[in-house]
Design a protein with these regions (language model features):
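Bacterial N-terminal signal peptides that target proteins for export
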Residues: 3-16
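C-terminal motif of bacterial Sec signal peptides marking the signal peptidase cleavage site
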Residues: 24-28
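Short, low-complexity, disordered segments immediately C-terminal to signal peptides
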Residues: 29-47
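Short, ordered beta-strand-loop transition motifs
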Residues: 37, 45, 64-70, 124-133
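Secretory pathway targeting signatures of secreted, lumenal, and periplasmic proteins
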Residues: 50-105
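Surface-exposed amphipathic alpha-helical segments
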Residues: 57-59, 168-197
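Extracytoplasmic/secreted envelope proteins and their assembly/folding machinery
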Residues: 101-108, 157, 184-191
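Signature of long, low-cysteine stretches enriched in small and polar/charged residues
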Residues: 105-162
Length: 197
């Protein structure tokens, strides 16, 4: 009887181990993981990356016919006819770029004169393991007041995340907003929402 009881315990333990292994395999252990998109956020999807945007805060996707040719995807926050926030994805925006550092240098050059860099750091993104290395640049700038942007002199906050996808295509993902409209936690969530393919 003891043997039967022990055997039953081993069978139960074996079933639990098999179930755990099955769940691990289904969850993609060692494979592609995805960024964490917070509740109340939407997602912009492109062939190289996907990124979250704060939909509940008023951001909405811009139709392809309305966005600039350099942008693969855009979400805008428009208030009283002014673009007070933007999330954009640019792909293949520079030539001769082979890694995250080079992508960040090219993307950083596009931040513009008069911008103040606040921080630059290496980050690890979710997604294809070969393409997870990226660089984050935090900066501030002053709105020009042109092209439906906030009044001239308005301080703006920005973050750009740059890297190279698994097919060696450089990407730059930006979020800009009127300073104070997005918290540091929101900006961290933006970076954490990225999945690179």
């Amino acid at each position: 009887m003891t043997l039967t009881s022990t055997s039953t315990k081993f069978r139960a333990l074996g079933a639990a181990v098999v179930a755990t292994l099955g769940l691990t395999l289904l969850s993609g252990c060692g494979g592609e993981d995805a960024g964490t998109v917070p509740d109340g956020w939407g997602t912009l999807d492109t062939k190289s990356v996907s990124v979250g945007y704060p939909e509940a805060a008023g951001y909405a996707p811009q139709p392809a016919a309305e966005r600039g040719k350099a942008n693969a995807a855009v979400a805008l926050k428009v208030e009283k006819g002014l673009r007070t926030g933007m999330v954009s994805v640019q792909l293949n925006f520079a030539t001769g770029v082979g890694d995250a550092g080079e992508a960040a240098a090219a993307a950083g050059a596009g931040i513009g004169l008069g911008a103040t860099r606040k921080d630059t750091q290496d980050v690890r993104l979710a997604g294809e393991e070969s393409a997870q290395e990226a660089r984050r640049i935090d900066y501030e700038f002053t709105s020009s007041g042109e092209e439906s942007t906030p009044a001239k002199g308005t301080r703006m906050t920005g973050v750009v995340v740059a890297g190279v996808d698994s097919k060696d295509v450089p990407f730059a993902i930006r979020i800009n907003a009127v300073k104070g409209e997005l918290s540091p936690a929101d900006l961290d969530s933006f970076v954490g929402s990225v999945t690179v393919r």
